């Protein structure tokens, strides 16, 4: 019985390792956000040091900057609304992240996550249903299939329920019913230039348009919906690609 359990445990460990390796990048990664390009290490390099990587998106539309701590230190300081930080490395596998108003001592939200060595993660700070703050931690899988572009949409706006996402002019949606605080994972698409149309469940509301996005092969594009219930929805956009081409999300 002991030998059987040991064998099963070993198989599970191998499977987990293979799954985690599949999300790693072989090369360093260029991220374009807000017109700025940053470079982060390869997943293989980070894994060799027993580290993972994490970044922060401030989707809290309160016009206040935020700090986030984790791994027993401050990871991000004075991050303004709609800002996407560069990746930083963390060494612990179980990390409790805490969200603070900038330069304040009392946290307003926290979240714990199991971080796999060599993997990349995005923390999204977003409003909760009661006007406070919460955090979602999402794993980044940024390498699309050969010749494809990759897209994901994160719904961080309490005013948008069950979002449907489509490329204008195409019959079938890319994603359906993305609820608030959720994302529907990534989808690989044929490279194209198109307007992304996002609709909530209110038939009387106008669609949210991200116009003339140039989806390039080899790139992963993220769109974050943000805004309070009483204010217009805004979008935060950024893209990632393994080095070898660093041109970013084109909005004309």
Q: For the regions a protein language model found, what residue spans apply to each?
A:
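Sec-dependent bacterial lipoprotein signal peptides
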Residues: 1-18
């Amino acid at each position: 019985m002991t030998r059987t359990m040991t064998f099963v445990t070993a198989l599970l460990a191998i499977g987990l390792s293979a799954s985690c390796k599949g999300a790693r990048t072989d090369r360093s990664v260029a991220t374009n956000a807000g017109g700025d390009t940053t470079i982060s290490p390869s997943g293989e390099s980070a894994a060799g040091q027993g580290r993972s990587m994490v970044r922060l998106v401030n989707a809290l539309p309160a016009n206040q900057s935020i700090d986030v701590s984790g791994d027993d230190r401050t990871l991000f300081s004075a991050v303004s609304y709609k800002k996407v930080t560069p990746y930083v490395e963390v060494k612990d596998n179980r990390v409790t992240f805490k969200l603070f108003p900038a330069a304040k001592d009392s946290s307003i939200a926290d979240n714990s996550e199991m971080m796999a060595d060599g993997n990349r993660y995005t923390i999204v700070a977003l409003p909760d249903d009661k006007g406070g703050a919460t955090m979602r931690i999402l794993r980044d899988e940024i390498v699309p299939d050969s010749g494809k572009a990759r897209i994901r949409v994160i719904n961080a706006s309490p005013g948008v329920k069950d979002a449907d996402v489509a490329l204008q002019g195409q019959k079938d949606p890319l994603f359906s019913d993305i609820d608030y605080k959720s994302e529907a994972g990534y989808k690989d698409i044929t490279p194209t230039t198109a307007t992304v149309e996002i609709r909530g469940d209110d038939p009387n509301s106008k669609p949210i348009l991200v116009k003339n996005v140039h989806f390039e092969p080899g790139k992963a594009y993220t769109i974050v919906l943000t805004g309070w219930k009483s204010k217009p929805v805004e979008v935060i956009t950024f893209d990632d690609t393994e080095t070898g081409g660093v041109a970013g999300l084109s909005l004309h």
